[in-house]
Amino acid sequence: MSITPQEALQRTIEHREIFHDEMLHLMRLIMRGELSPVMAAAIITGLRVKKETIGEITAAATVMREFARHVEVQDNSNFVDIVGTGGDGSHTFNISTATMFVSAAAGAKVAKHGGRSVSSKSGSADVLEALGVNIDLQPEQVAASIAETGMGFMFAPNHHPAMKNIAPVRRELGVRTIFNILGPLTNPAGAPNQLMGVFHADLVGIQVRVMQRLGAKHVLVVYGMDGMDEVSLGAATQVGELRDGQIHEYEIHPEDFGMQMVSNRTLKVADANESKAMLLEALDNKPGVAREIVTLNAGTALYSANVASSIADGIQLAREAIASGKARAKVDELARFTQQFKQ
């Protein structure tokens, strides 16, 4: 079913849904650069004001996946993506990147999909470069990295070239749009399991249902109720879990896992170098909030990857991976492996 851009805009003004096939058509126009910047800006702003529906987000994610440069991974077992929407304004060190190293050391395969800074002063790409990792890899090189090291980083601009058509519009608008929530839904390696942090409580139920429609296996969508797009130590965390096609929504607390509730204020950083220093402190097993929050998030990721049978079991595996030095060794392993592809 086709819809004109003008009809779509009128729908958003009237707070009416754009149906699945119509949204597929619209998104393809956007990704091919066939909508004028004015019309593209009007539609994505209209969707934001109306509030995007699960159906609209699912259709948009389907099209972004169509246009992506895919990473072919042979073995999907224990394969997980660890990602946040960003935009939570917390300015913390890069917790999800530290979580990747711990999870890989404990037996998961991690396909991390990310870019430069959104909410932190240092995005996953920024801190990985500071750690000596070459992020500018071709899809087949990322696949080799996952096979060899258990980790692969997919720098979003390399895998979503069609996004260049909407990037100037997004930059000029300067407000959140549907594209802020599409990134975590469009992992180019198609990881069936995911730990996804979101920037608003309302997104927990929405994103987990979108992942259900997209055919994901085991997903935990999390929102720290102190505002973090991570599992938080400073408050309860709202969780939407998809497993075996079923969705369960619940809350978890640090105390559930024998951890103390502490403020996340000490996790704030000013730039990629500070983020790197705090990440390495955590992986070097230095006692403190950084190590604890990485352990908590890695435990959750290991549960999502089906390496662990529960979050508590995952936390135990994460502690062992850090204490043994295996997690810290993963940093150097990824840096060494990716540098061979440097142009």
Curated annotation (Swiss-Prot):
Anthranilate 1 binds at G84. Keywords: Amino-acid biosynthesis, Aromatic amino acid biosynthesis, Glycosyltransferase, Magnesium, Metal-binding, Transferase, Tryptophan biosynthesis. It catalyses: N-(5-phospho-beta-D-ribosyl)anthranilate + diphosphate = 5-phospho-alpha-D-ribose 1-diphosphate + anthranilate. Pathway: Amino-acid biosynthesis; L-tryptophan biosynthesis; L-tryptophan from chorismate: step 2/5. Anthranilate 2 binds at R170. Its EC number is 2.4.2.18. It is an enzyme of class 2 (transferase). One of its GO terms (biological process) is L-tryptophan biosynthetic process. Homodimer. This is Anthranilate phosphoribosyltransferase. It comes from Paraburkholderia xenovorans (strain LB400). The gene is trpD.
